[in-house]
Swiss-Prot record:
Pfam family, one: GMPPB_C
Residues holding GDP-alpha-D-mannose: E85, Q247
Protein name in UniProt: Mannose-1-phosphate guanylyltransferase regulatory subunit alpha
Annotated GO CC locations: cytoplasm; GDP-mannose pyrophosphorylase complex
Gene: Gmppa
Free-text comment about domains: The N-terminal substrate-binding domain adopts a Rossman-like fold and has a binding pocket for GTP or GDP-alpha-D-mannose.
GO biological process, alphabetically ordered: cognition; GDP-mannose biosynthetic process; GDP-mannose metabolic process; glycoprotein metabolic process; motor behavior; muscle organ morphogenesis; negative regulation of biosynthetic process; negative regulation of nucleobase-containing compound metabolic process
Family to which this protein belongs: Belongs to the transferase hexapeptide repeat family.
Length: 420
């Protein structure tokens, strides 16, 4: 018997995902046509012996989350439950706080997945590796280039046994090109080190003179408090993958993740990909179109395009490397490139909405997405264009490398701006 835990965080996380996270919790943002964490749940449901999937976070259980959980339970015929933390508890605190629910039914092991990663989720391969050598912690690792590895948790392994000898979260100097994917397989014994950290935090808290400044005994950071401390003690091992993987920290990385998932649909869900049909729009590459969307036959879509529920695409529209969300309208002959068009937004005819891709270097197979800040030297860096919810773009204007916050009605062109 197996279980899975998906760590979905909470509203004060995902600030780099704004303005998109204003409308829906980041884990429910549609990537390649389905909510981000549905990819995780699909992968978990395919593992033989999976009995239950738990979501842990500190979002209020609103209508969107409740509807998603109900739909997921029906689709995958598995219990999918949300466990709400009373306060942000870090990547490990929620696991310890809800340990009784996780261990109910005596699972052989349980997967732990961060919500903000895109992957092909080689969970069965991880389970096989775990059953060959049973250890408390198994981490999924991949490689990054020397410079970008500093942005991730870095793993030094024993090449023969794959034991983790050293672990540093976001080191200041180069440690290793093997990085942590944020996908784990834990045995029930893995909760004992979490208990030790909790008890140590309790003692430290009692010694603190100003308890108001102390985050609380329940806050446990898996990476710093557990992995770094236990590395080299024969408890943590790494399983390397060369499959697709990327973090989803910013809106730009959601667009890149959409491309990776759409490419993977060729193998896993070919029925989700649009096909060129007589009298239909021209399809280039991998495109997802929701069944309720209305697309004019003279439109040209793709590659890497995802069109949401109730979207209207007018005659002569050109759409490439973009996500168009629920209820948006692209009027005749608009051109949308490297952009995300928000819920219920309207782009006027002959308007152009364009961004600059921030993709990994295609000439470096180990390159990853750069999660840079929006600004450098006081200037907005070129990036994808994002239109928030219910934005209105007039006819015949250009919106380039800009972020437009929700409910704005523009009257002219903008370049390299954040429109508040």
């Amino acid at each position: 018997m197996l279980k899975a835990v998906i760590l979905i965080g909470g509203p004060q996380k995902g600030t780099r995902f704004r303005p998109l996270s204003f409308e829906v919790p980041k884990p429910l943002f549609p990537v390649a046509g389905v909510p981000m964490i549905q990819h995780h749940i699909e992968a978990c449901a395919q593992v033989p012996g999976m009995q239950e999937i738990l979501l842990i976070g500190f979002y209020q259980p609103d209508e969107a989350l409740t509807q998603f959980l109900e739909a997921a339970q029906q689709e995958f015929n598995l219990p999918v439950r949300y466990l709400q933390e009373f306060t942000p508890l870090g990547t490990g605190g929620g696991l310890y706080h809800f340990r009784d629910q996780i261990l109910a039914g005596a699972p052989e092991a349980f997967f732990v997945l961060n919500a903000d990663v895109c992957s092909d989720f080689p969970l069965s391969a991880m389970l096989d590796a775990h059953r060959l050598q049973r250890h408390p912690f198994l981490l999924l690792g991949t490689t990054a280039n020397r410079t970008q590895s500093l942005n991730y948790g870095c793993i030094v392994e024993n090449p023969q046994t794959h034991e983790v000898l050293h672990y540093v979260e976001k080191p200041s100097t180069f440690i290793s090109d093997i990085i942590n994917c944020g996908i784990y397989l834990f045995s029930p014994e893995a909760l004992k080190p979490l208990r030790d950290v909790f008890q140590r935090n309790q003692q430290d808290g009692q010694l603190e003179e100003s308890p108001g400044s102390w985050p609380g005994a329940g806050t446990i950071r898996l990476e710093q408090d557990v992995f770094s401390a236990l590395a080299g003690q024969g408890q943590i091992y790494v399983h390397l993958t060369d499959g697709i993987w990327s973090q989803i920290k910013s809106a730009g990385s959601a667009l890149y993740a959409s491309r990776l998932y759409l490419g993977r649909y060729q193998i896993t869900h070919p029925e989700r990909l649009a096909r060129h049909t007589a009298g239909g729009p021209r399809i280039r590459g991998n495109v997802y179109i929701h069944p309720t969307a209305k697309v004019a036959p003279s439109a040209v879509l793709g590659p890497n395009v995802s069109i949401g529920k109730g979207v209207t695409i007018g005659e002569g529209v050109r759409l490439r490397e973009s996500i168009v969300l629920h209820g948006a309208t692209l009027q005749e002959h608009t051109c949308v490139l490297h952009s995300i068009v928000g819920w219920g937004s309207t782009v006027g005819r002959w308007a152009r909405v364009e961004g600059t891709p921030n993709d990994p270097n295609p000439n470096d197979p180990r390159a990853r997405m750069d999660s840079e800040s929006l600004f450098k030297d006081g200037k907005l860096l070129p990036a994808i264009t994002i239109l928030g919810c219910r934005v209105r773009i007039p006819a015949e204007v250009l919106i380039l490398n800009s972020i437009v916050l929700p409910h704005k009605e523009l009257s002219r062109s903008f370049t390299n701006q954040i429109i508040l």
